[in-house]
Amino acid sequence: MHALGHCCTVVTTRGPSHWLLLLDTHLGTLPGFKVSAGRGLPAAEVYFEAGPRVSLSRTDATIVAVYQSILFQLLGPTFPASWTEIGATMPHNEYTFPRFISNPPQFATLAFLPLLSPTSPLDLRALMVTAQLMCDAKRLSDEYTDYSTLSASLHGRMVATPEISWSLYVVLGIDSTQTSLSYFTRANESITYMRYYATAHNIHLRAADLPLVAAVRLDDLKDHQIPAPGSWDDLAPKLRFLPPELCLLLPDEFDLIRVQALQFLPEIAKHICDIQNTICALDKSFPDCGRIGGERYFAITAGLRLDQGRGRGLAGWRTPFGPFGVSHTDVFQRLELLGDAVLGFIVTARLLCLFPDASVGTLVELKMELVRNEALNYLVQTLGLPQLAEFSNNLVAKSKTWADMYEEIVGSIFTGPNGIYGCEEFLAKTLMSPEHSKTVGSACPDAVTKASKRVCMGEAGAHEFRSLVDYACEQGISVFCSSRVSTMFLERLRDIPAEDMLDWYRLGIQFSHRSGLSGPGGVVSVIDIMTHLARGLWLGSPGFYVEQQTDKNESACPPTIPVLYIYHRSVQCPVLYGSLTETPTGPVASKVLALYEKILAYESSGGSKHIAAQTVSRSLAVPIPSGTIPFLIRLLQIALTPHVYQKLELLGDAFLKCSLALHLHALHPTLTEGALTRMRQSAETNSVLGRLTKRFPSVVSEVIIESHPKIQPDSKVYGDTFEAILAAILLACGEEAAGAFVREHVLPQVVADA
């Protein structure tokens, strides 16, 4: 089989670059293809140059692939990271260097070779001769170990040392029986490197592969050497160091699959096998976050922070999350900006649900307490990612750095395939994880134990809920990683009337008796019961657990308790929430509406506000799910009611920041975090939002003036009303409709950064 090629020009934000494009014959001819602007990627068009096709044999194409991989190591990759919509006959193919996948394809469907210009003659013969020379079985100089004295195969290990800029290398010649390395030394110097990290497992290379590996002469360690006792001559211990990323790029034809199978990830700087196990564990713990989300991104983040921007090793790589011309620092800061907005939105929504009677000031105070840098700094260190905390003294100048890392993870998950749902899953299992609760050593009273069991069975009465709350208050619990917030939580929970708490329970809790976490030995204290109940009410995380007090010390099967989401889940779960029709009927639908009105401190008054709400609902150019118009009108009435819409405004403000951050992140992949922040702020000022409010039908302004006879044209009330209307759309119609509303009205108001 032969591989066809075309000369083409790739036009990106960095300007045009010329390539030889190789593709497999079975894909057929291509009329042209377009590079889409994916999340974090710039748009690019590809144009074919006139001229004959280039035809290469499979062997020659493989040589070209090897040659280009070497060039990429020397010059850095400059081709697009993700190609989509590549004609009608070509499937989607994500082609990135370095590869962060466990089993890369044996031969790349697309292979790119940089050219001086698209019109220059391509001397394939010279190219193949050059590549063949690199692949021929040539020996290293006498400075290095003579391969002719080696056995049929070699063992090696991946080794890293911070004294050499955290660059990572394959050390060829480490005996398979050797369990550790003693130290690094530099030739002709008295320096001894004592800090190093090596993989626990050996890498096996065939002798036939060694000439190819040895021929790749990069400017790495030059005359560094390492004592290698065992089967090696102690008088000539010099060995060749090879950056492992190059091994990962070589085609499978050269039998380096064992190296590829190590799944090289940046944080191998401590121990590659431990990191792989961690990634697998994270994947099992957070299956809904998406593989493109926090796990892989955190690996890249950790590795680059370890490198500390020295410009070698890890810092020289381009990640799939960053477009051309954007540094790693800029990529992380952009994701931090996005994650901060997403975190603020989810926390705001959950607090509104958890504390329906709290004032806006109290809610803001709670939110600031939950997302403060010190709390997030602690959370990052409890995620179970190994070895990172050990480097904190060297890497973290401020505690804010770790908090930024958490926000970067949230932002990365948000840009992944699961979006806001992946973020909710991640927050539910990290921000409010079981490690943050304080258990009580004493046994629960029988009354509390029985009440707990009845709660789990769905048969609890109001007095039994109250007994759990009172017991929790007496014992004291630690929630949200803050004793101050814990106290505020208990006060709010204790202030809820028992009968209302029962309504919360019946409305918001669905039971799943076949899943859930367990404490040590399957026994969890009643303090954990209340703590997990709080988490369930707020984040929909795995619920509370019951200690079954029996003579045999057997544990009851604990349920998992997802809860009432305070926004558009009502649209997506009609079975649970009933039919939100013109005249809601049934206990569930009535209770839901009553709960919303209680949370937002609203009592329907009809009149002009009802008419205005109907008018606004008809003027919205957004997708509105069927059956939600009455619900939307009720919420729009709240949005137009003075001194009542504050909580809607709080939610709308949080969603506006989140939505604008996402849109700007996708539309401007090369801008820095500072530029994106300035652009977002230009569109969310009160003056801009006030002007948008005045563009609604005149009845809206009439209602506002009726409520504020002396209102000034530039009053903050207009901007607050817009945010409240946005929140009403969010609650009634969901994120898609609210996002469309932001795109239609707010996004055009963004001022481009100079």
From Swiss-Prot:
SMART domains reported in the protein's UniProt record: PAZ, RIBOc
Residues binding Mn(2+) 1, per UniProt: E336, D404, E407
Domain spans labelled RNase III: 298-418, 613-734
Keywords associated with the record: Endonuclease, Hydrolase, Magnesium, Manganese, Metal-binding, Nuclease, Nucleotide-binding, Repeat, RNA-binding, RNA-mediated gene silencing
Domain of life from the UniProt record: Eukaryota
Record GO biological process: regulatory ncRNA-mediated gene silencing; RNA processing
EC number(s) recorded for this UniProt protein: 3.1.26.-
Cofactor(s) required for function per UniProt: Mg(2+); Mn(2+)
First-tier enzyme category under EC: hydrolase
Keyword Isomerase set for record: no
CDD domains associated with the record: RIBOc
Protein residues bound to Mn(2+) 2: E649, D720, E723
Domain PAZ: 132-251
A GO molecular function held by the record: metal ion binding
Co-factor: note: Binds 2 magnesium or manganese ions per subunit.
Function statement: Involved in cleaving double-stranded RNA in the RNA interference (RNAi) pathway. It produces 21 to 23 bp dsRNAs (siRNAs) which target the selective destruction of homologous RNAs.
Subunit-level organization: Homodimer.
Protein's name according to its UniProt entry: Endoribonuclease Dicer-like
Source organism of the structure: Giardia intestinalis (strain ATCC 50803 / WB clone C6)
